[in-house]
Amino acid sequence: MPIKDKNRIDEKFVEDNVKKFLIKDGFLDNGKRKESWEHGVDIKMKHRDYGSYYLVECKGEPGARGVVKSFSGSMSSSINSAIGQIISRMHTKRRSRYGGYNFSVAFPVSFREKVIKRIPFYACKNLRLSLFFVEHNGDVEKITWSELKKIQENR
């Protein structure tokens, strides 16, 4: 049966709360909002004190924008899409450890278990990729490659 739920977390909610999280961590918001038809990452923020950037691809829950037939299938497709989109934006020469680009994918908390099972920690380590999960109340959890390694080893 098709699912549409107005209580699902949409992409804008994920994006807004990840931005708030990064601002608290010292990153600057340029105030620009990417339209759905525009190309590029959903969030690009520079640290206020040094040349480090965060590039984040955000996804919302299936059913937040319209009817879906398979929640799980749509969720898997969203995960694959986010990973592909962020990897396709890794065209940078800035590779220094403390200045350069940090890449991330951000999802609603309902994606957490599936993403943790799907993305290997060593891929996150080599790609400088972190994970963000947004709760219904707006709280954000950030998981780095080393935290992901501990989670995956304890399963």
Feature names for model-found ranges:
Residues 18-26, 86, 90-94, 120-124:
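Hydrophobic, Leu/Ile/Phe/Ala-enriched alpha-helical segments that form helix-helix packing faces
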Residues 60-111:
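Catalytic cores of nucleic-acid endonucleases
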Residues 15, 39, 82-85, 115-116:
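Amphipathic coiled-coil/heptad-repeat helices and related helical stalk/stem segments
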Residues 40-44, 53-57, 104:
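Short hydrophobic-acidic sequence motifs that mark active-site Asp/Glu residues
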Residues 104-155:
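Domain-level recognition of nuclease-like catalytic cores that cleave nucleotide substrates
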Residues 1-39, 46-51, 62, 96-98:
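Acidic-basic catalytic patches of nuclease active cores, encompassing PD-(D/E)XK
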